[in-house]
Amino acid sequence: MPKLDLAKVPVRTGTRYPPPYDVPCRDRHRLQLGDGGGLSQFGVNLLTLKPGVWSSQRHWHRKEDEFVYILSGEVVLITDAGEEAMKAGDCAAFPANDGNGHHLVNRSNADAMLLEVGTRSGGDS
């Protein structure tokens, strides 16, 4: 497949969470790189979190592995172990069915950009 034209890659802004759970994730912005490249086995997203925005509600996946790499800015990773600051160059992995809920929160004053990679196993959101 040739180089992706980022202007043609699908973008998803906001969330599918119902109120009031949608509020902290409302301004997240996902450039769906995997979809733009026709990938079917795993998803790849370029996620931008503005200050105060969450990546998601805290969650874990039964069937899907998930990986995040911080490209720029700073976020706070929240898991069962507590809170951990992450900056550009840091990464985290979330194996399927580990039961440790996670999410990322941008508590800084600048945008944060992350690369998300995850299995597409269906029926596991």
Identify the residue ranges that each predicted region occupies.
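Double-stranded beta-helix
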Residues: 105-125
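Short acidic-glycine-tyrosine-enriched beta hairpin
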Residues: 80-97
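Short, conserved, surface-exposed binding loops centered on an aromatic residue
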Residues: 35-38, 48, 59-61, 67-68, ...
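Short, conserved beta-strand element in jelly-roll/cupin
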Residues: 46-50, 61-79, 117-121
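A short, N-terminal "cap"/entry segment at the start of jelly-roll beta-barrel domains
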Residues: 1-41
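Conserved short histidine dyad/triad with adjacent acidic residue
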Residues: 27-30, 45-61, 99
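Short beta-strand His + acidic residue motifs that chelate non-heme Fe in jelly-roll/DSBH
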Residues: 57, 77-78, 94, 101-107
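Short, charged/polar surface micro-motifs in flexible loops or helix N-caps
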Residues: 50-54, 74, 83, 98, ...
